[in-house]
Amino acid sequence: MKTLGEFIIEKQAEYPEAKGELSGILSSIRLAAKIIHREINRAGLSQDILGVAGSENIQGEAQMKLDVFANETMKKALLAREEVAGFASEEDDNFVAFENDRAKNAKYILMTDPLDGSSNIDVNVSVGTIFSIYKRVSPIGSPVTMEDFLQEGRKQVASGYVTYGSSTMLVYTTGNGVNGFTYDPSLGLFILSHPDMKMPTEGKYYSINEGQYVTFPMGVKKFIKYCQESDEATKRPYSSRYIGSLVSDFHRNLLKGGIYIYPTSTVYPKGKLRLLYEGNPMAFLAEQAGGMATDGFNPILDIKPSELHQRVPFFVGSTSMVKQADKFMQECAE
């Protein structure tokens, strides 16, 4: 039995030049995940932490009370260790520069969707936390700048998510494979339960909000029809599974094989998901597990961000399924 802490130390020892900053950040995320896990498990017993907070994020979306709690928990956990120079969240209008001397000398910045799928909390459906870590590009010792956050996803040094469901799991990569750890609340420890995770090349699930079908581009409509057709050679029809929480849908497809799609639409002409907080971290995980992630045409990780809350169409999952979806998109664009 190997704990997350032991695994982090073991991996750090493989890099003699490492000074432990990244390990410290992962430990901060581990602590935040435990606190968020505890609060989510109390949600049904305390109305104080359920429902709408009465505020909106920069996207104009109503913030749930647990959105605000998870965001502040992540921020405080990172501030306590002073291993990151700056922090950006889907829930905040702008990035936060950590101004104390040690933080200003830190090498890394972190971006997060602190509680993905939070609208599901009231009905006891799985939610998650997504995170993404980069090396800063601004001079060490100075406050972070916008350029530190507007980096291509290919430059991530680590990304991951925590899924709060029937069990709580932390899944992450540092660019050398994907590993999953299940939380044992009786011990207060994350235990390595899913070493070297691989996404099946072929899948049998497609995850998309079909209630929005009439708003989708033709390429997506044709792919949905393809998924529903019978064909023994490709083991179709595929099964439709859509939870409404990116982390939950992605996690199932990582284990079982499948594709998750949130495309452009007449309602969201640029897509709905955020490139920096959702697209890049999940795309990095997918590629590290042998999967694929695109915007329907090009790899997500190659997109150069132009703004902090940039939206993106998102196709992620088993390689064969993403390639097939991209093929329909490209044919309909010609």
Swiss-Prot record:
GO annotation, biological process: fructose 1,6-bisphosphate metabolic process; fructose 6-phosphate metabolic process; fructose metabolic process; gluconeogenesis; sucrose biosynthetic process
Binding, Mg(2+) 1: E90, D113, L115
Cofactor annotation comment: Binds 2 magnesium ions per subunit.
Enzyme kind, highest EC tier: hydrolase
Subcellular location: Cytoplasm
Gene Ontology cellular component annotations, sorted alphabetically: cytosol
Assembly notes: Homotetramer.
Stated family: Belongs to the FBPase class 1 family.
Record protein name field: Fructose-1,6-bisphosphatase class 1
Species per Swiss-Prot/TrEMBL record: Actinobacillus pleuropneumoniae serotype 3 (strain JL03)
Gene that produces this protein: fbp
